[in-house]
Every structure is written in C-alpha cells, then in structure tokens.
UniProtKB/Swiss-Prot annotation:
Motif (DEAH box): 416-419
Composition skew (Basic and acidic residues), residue ranges: 86-102
Keyword terms: ATP-binding, Cell cycle, DNA-binding, Helicase, Hydrolase, Iron, Iron-sulfur, Isomerase, Metal-binding, Nucleotide-binding, Nucleus
Name of the protein: ATP-dependent DNA helicase CHL1
GO biological process, one term: interstrand cross-link repair
InterPro entries: ATP-dep_Helicase_C, DinG/Rad3-like, DNA/RNA_helicase_DEAH_CS, Helic_SF1/SF2_ATP-bd_DinG/Rad3, Helicase-like_DEXD_c2, P-loop_NTPase, RAD3-like_helicase_DEAD, Rad3/Chl1-like
Annotated source species: Lodderomyces elongisporus (strain ATCC 11503 / CBS 2605 / JCM 1781 / NBRC 1676 / NRRL YB-4239)
Region (Disordered) residue spans: 80-126
EC class (word): isomerase
Protein task: ATP-dependent DNA helicase important for chromosome transmission and normal cell cycle progression in G(2)/M. May have a role in changing DNA topology to allow the loading of proteins involved in maintaining sister chromatid cohesion in the vicinity of the centromeres. Has a specific role in chromosome segregation during meiosis II.
Protein family per UniProt: Belongs to the DEAD box helicase family. DEAH subfamily. DDX11/CHL1 sub-subfamily.
Protein residues bound to [4Fe-4S] cluster: 302, 320, 330, 373
Amino acid sequence: MTSLPSPSARTCRDYHHPYDPYDIQLQFMDALYETLQNGYKIGMFESPTGTGKTLSIICSSMTWLRDYKRNYNLNTKLLEGNVSNNDDKQAGEDHEGTKGKDDDDDDDDDDDDDDDDDDDDDEPEWVKMAYQKSIVDKSKNKLKDFERHLNEVDQAYKRRVQKNKEANLGTKIRNVARKQQTQEDPEESFLPNDYNETNQESFINDVESRNLQLSTEIERLMKSSIINNNGSGSNAVDDAAAAAAAAATDDECPTKIFFTSRTHSQLNQFSSQLRLTKFDASFKDLEERTKYLPLGSRKQLCINDKVKNRKGEQSINDACIDLQKTKKGCTYLPNPSNSSTISSATKEFADLSLAQIRDIEDLGDLGSSLHTCPYYSVREGIKLAEVISLPYQLLLQSGSRDALKLDIKNSIIIIDEAHNIFDTLTSLYSVKITAAQLSRTIKALKIYMTKFLKKLNSGNRINLMKLTKLCKLLMDFLQSDLAKSAKLGDQVVGEEIFQGSTGDLVNIHKMEAYLNKSKIAFKLQSYMEKIGVEDVGTDFKLNSSSPILFDIVKFLKCLSYPKKEGKFFWDRIYGDNGGCEVSLNYMLLDPCAVFKEIVDQAKCVILCGGTMEPTSDFTDYLFPSIKHNKIKKFACGHIIPKNNLKVIPVGQYYGNFDFLYNRRNDLDQFKRLGEFLIKICEIVPAGIVVFISSYQLLSDIVKIWRETTIYSRLNLLKQVFEESVENTKLTSLLSEYSYVINTQCKGAILLAVVGGKMSEGINFSDNLARAVIMVGMPYPNAFSGEIVAKRNFIEEQVITKGGTIQQARAKSYEYYDNLCMKAVNQSIGRSIRHAKDYAIIILLDYRYQTPKVQGKLSKWVRDRIANNTTANTFDPFLETKKFFSFPIRSTK
C-alpha cells in the first residue's frame, strides 16, 4: 500500500463531513477523490475498524459525484444543446436545398455552408453566453421542479399516514390482505408447470424474462399514470410537477455510485451514515437532496406473507414467480385490469423512495402502507438515483443485474469489506453434493410421484422419472470404488460421472430446461413441508437454505454449462458425530473472469476494508489484466494515539511457541500456553479474547487444561468462556461474557476460533478486549479438496504461462500463506473501535517475529510492533505491565 501524503500535499477541499474529521479521514477522502478524478480503474483502500471508514467513503465519493455532475451540466449539456441546435439548422438548410436543386448547385452549397460557419463564429459573445445560460437554466429548472415534486409527494404521504393512523385504517387493510394470503392452497398448487419438451427452448430463461416483463409493465403503467393524471385522489400532484418528474427521467446523470457490502447490517449502517450528510447541489443556488435507493432480494423486500415466509432464497424466488402465474396473481403487483390504481401506488412508491434516505426495512414498511410490491416498485427509481446500495450477490451476478435493469456502465462501484469478495464469488458459482443428499432427494421424488402421478402430464412424468434416474446414477457414482479411493482435490471430468452407465442418454441441457420451466424444486419442497417429511435423514451439514432439490438443480446446471474457470473435484464433508462422507464439488477457481465484466464496464472500482492485507491476491487473481499504473493503493493508520496500542510477537516461553500442524498434539506446548495466559491474566484488566485456529484444537487444548490445574487457576483469575460451533449459543455467550466484565472486577477471558462468528462479525470495543491474543498461525487444512484444487489450478496457470515448477509451487504457496494472514488480520482487527479505545495484541508463535510474516500484517498493526522482540532480554510480561501502567490505562 502507498504511503500517506504529507500534510502540505493535501487539498483543502470541503467534503461536507458532518463532524470535524480526523487527519487520517482527510487523507482517506483526498485519496479516494483523486482516484476518481484522475482516471484510476481500481482503488484499494484500507482503513482500520473504528476509523469512520463509511462516512469517509460517502463524503469523498458524493463530493466527487456532485462536482462531476456540475461539470457535466455545464459542459455536456451545452454540447448536446449545440449539437441539437446545429442539427435543427442543418435540417432546415437541407429542406431548403431540395427545392429545385440540380448538380450545378453543389459548389454554391459548399460556399453557403462556409458562410454559415463564419456567421456562427461572428456571433457576439453576449449571444453565446445567453445561449449557454438558457441551456443550463433548462436543466436546472427540471431539477428544481423535480425536487419540489418530491417534497410535495413526501408531505402528502405523511399527512395521509397520520390521518390513517388516527382512523386506524391501515391495520384493517393489512389484516384483510394477510388473511387472504394465508388461506390454504389446494393440492393443485403443488403440481409442476405443464411441460412440453418440444417447446423447451422458450423456457430456459423463464424466471428472468418474467421479471423483465413485470418491470416493463410497471414502467408502462407509471408513464400512463403520469400522462393521464387528472389531479384527483389522496396522493395527487399537479400536472406541472408530474410533467417535471417525467422529464427528469430523461435527464439523469450517466454516472452513479453503487455501494455493495456483504451483510444486511452493513448496508443498513451505510443508510444511517448517509442520513447524516448533505452536499452541494449540482447547480449553484439550489437545494438538492441525495437521491438514494437500497436494493435487496425478494427475501428482504417481499411483503406477501405466503411468499416471504418460505425457507431459502431460491424457494422464495420461485414462489413469487409461481404466484404471479395464478389467476388471482399477487395482491401487491400490477394488474392490467386495474392499472390506474396500481400504477398510482407504484409511482408514489418510486417517488417516496427517493424523497428520503430509507433503508430496506423502510421500503418494506412503505410498500405495506401503499399496498404495492417494494421488490419490483423500487426499480422505477433507479434511473434518477445517485447512490444505490445492494448486497454482493445482486452486483456480482450478471443475471441479477439484468433482472434489476442495473446499468453499471461508467459508474463508480464501491465494494466494502472487500476481503470477503473472493469467498463470495466462489460461493455464488460453486456447489457440492453427497450420496446422502441424493438419497434424500430420491426418496422425496418417490413420495411426490406416488401422490401426483395421475395428475401429471406426459412431459412431467417422463422428466421426473429421468430426474430420479439421474439422481440415482449420481448417487451410485458417489458410492463407487473410484469415489472411495479418490484423493481430496482430485479433478473429476464430467464424462466420468456417467461412464459405464446409461446416464449419457439423459440430455443434461434438456433436463436443465425442464427444471427451469417446471419449478419442480420449489413444488417438491412445498409439498414436503406440507406433509412434514422435509428431513429424511442425514447427519451431514449441507446448505440448509437450499433444501432437498435446489443444490441438485444447481449442480446439474454446472454439469450442463461448466465454466472453463471452474472444475469438478472430490472432497469430504464432516458431520457433528465425527463421521465423514465423500462429496462431489464444482468450484469456481478463477474469479477474475466473472469480475472482469464489472471492471470493464465501470468507470472505477473501489475496494475498501479494514483488513486488505495481503493485497497481492487482489492484483493476481481478481484483476490481473489491469496495469499497475491504473491501480491506486492507500492504507491509513488508526485514529487512536500511537501509545494506545502495542503489538507483541512472542516466540517462546520455556521453549518455542511453534503451532505447526505436525505439532498439533504437543501436550507440553498446550501446558506452556496455559501458563503464559495465566501470567497475562494477572496483568491485563477486564476482558481478554484469545483466538485459536480451529474448534478441534480449542477442544484439545481445553481438555489438557482441565486434566491439570491450569483451567481452574485461569478461571479464578478471569471467568473462562468458550466459543461453540453452534451459532444458536452465540448471543447468550456474548451477553454473559459482557455481563461478567461489566459487573465483576476480575473480568473474563473468551476462547474464540479464527473463522468463527467471533473473529468476523463481532467488535470487541473497550473492556471487552483489553488484550487480543492470536495463538499460532491459522492456516486452512492444506489437504482439503478445495485448497488442493485451488493450488493445483494456480500451478497449472503458472506453468501454462511459461513458468517453472518451482515458480508454480511458490505461487500456490503464497496464495495459501495469504489465506492465513487475512484470517489473522481480520481477527486481531476487532479490538479497537474508537479514538479513545486501547488494547494490546499478542501474537504467539515464533513465525510472527519474522519480517516476512510481519510484512503481511495490516499497516496500522505493523507500525505498532514492539522493538527488539527477538532479543533474549525481551520480556513480554514487563512490556504488558508498562502498557497498562500508563495513566490513561487505569480507567476505562
């Protein structure tokens, strides 16, 4: 990452930060603004947790966008006006020239053109200035009218809500709708859509086309509403304002900011931070709100109880589409037979969604209030939005962008928590199946066919039998001798799966078309839930959000259209009971092909995070084709004073701390670790969080401590808490841990696992973590199928490009090493949350004392490593005492 600019080199630009920004926030905002302004294609920004990163992103990017729009309005609009004026003039000249024109007039026409050009050049300056002002004023007045229109709609809505609240009408309407929705469906609703194989081509993209058709219908109804609006009704606006709103849709700025993050809470935080800000308008002497839209999936935005309460996102999607095809349809969606009422609500929703900064929950409440679907209606505001937030999957999948009609060309893409981007891309395009899963599916299919066989048309009967046969062949393959003897990570060629069977007679492409058209996965799941046999017996933890058939469908799609950047390979799935089962995996191994489409279309892609190191993975595997001079790297320090954090690498305590995999059963080292922690607990106040590389290692260590006096001695000093693999216990564990720290003088110690919920989703501020201790280096299992397959792929790529075997192995090891260091940075970055916070970080392993490992720590951590930690005279306990004896440390 690049070094920080000197104070004298920074700009004095006003970023409209709602508070007095810290120096590092100004550095961050300067760097991001310059990245956008100077034509960089990629920006990589690291800002530690607790440094106000989100506000810095908002203020710098929105300041740039308003500056850009202001310049766009002054220059581009003027250019468009000149072109339009010249076109009109030329059209008039061409019309005149056609009267009595003959070949002898050609030279005269050329002379006339020259004369016209001279006339344009000779126009007085005041005429040119007046013309320029008229062009700019036209756009300014459009914006002013639209802002006034949004104000009027917002105020009218608030008055109506208050009136309805007083009359208690809203609840009555919603209860009636909910009662209608929860009525029991007849058995016919579980039947798959009729299927005729001769028409299968038209059904391949059925879901996507239906989404696009519905969006088009909403858009048509909105336009119709604007044209026919007669000013009546409780939410009426005058014709001039409606016309201004319609005109504004053709006058949007071509550049938008797309902000994406991994979790719902992070996106809501973005909304709340955006509410704090206010920026200069795109025109002088004008008030302009920030026009913001949060986009989400049906799971987040659906307000139909019958649909949104289904299990799994894909099941919700299919239920929505299925409901639209019924005679009554969905009560919240446009109905052509009642277009005036529905389009009015849809249009009002689109306006209200832009009138204020709202989060996803606000849009759900707004849709319920207006009795219109938020998922579809919110799209109608996209054209005029300046800032759009959305979860990773909606941005990273081209099909999702198409369904939402998202045009990311020339836009600013900001990816927050970017260290998650690799895992997200991989999971979106990867799937695994097991024999137990297939057995479960076959059993469910037999139950389903026994019930509905006589009601199925021939196309469904034939294809369900083929699907059952296909699942049986896949199950046999997973139980074959080949599968049992295969090494983890070994590649599987698609043709091998059906070799020696009649499976090759089943056309996978046609089967995929059938699955898309019939919605059998959704129908099957619905019926299984109704009769109460969803779980037909497996101890292995598969994706519970994709029950019964959905993962099988995804796997068959990968089998039908495998990406060249992905591969099939063998792996294992381990159950809670200690057993394991063979799995057949498909995994996207090269994410750059998927990401390239986004990079190519966007004006600039900004990757932000609290822990971006090591950064080489981004440049090597996410955008390798981007030249280094088009990549801006920035890393800032922390807002805390330098003496509020100390980092101590510890390589030995009565022997080396060496937590290599081959020493995972070193009982002596486990005991020395316990004795070290006891001495630390005697010094550190309040809470201590200890990160250990795996649940198994944590269990082994605690077992040894309990067999000796270590655990009881540790518990006397600080109450011991252990992270459980069960997520259901997380909330109660944290609550009890916090309660003990806040009510008992001795404090507590939390034994957590790297990669668990504690290491990624929880921030340990203030007394919750006065010390964070990392035990060993958390390398992932080198022999897992996914790691083996990924490293093999990297080595193949290096050799294909002319590299040696040694270079290939070095490159794949660097990837493996970086996985470990990312986990380290992510875990130890949870302790500092604000400017007055303080903590000590202890890294227990001799490898943390090496320059190579320290070079991959986050910059703000690296800068605070204690001096001379490898010297024989270095005493980590003395350093810890010094840290907490500093006056500020004596109180919270």
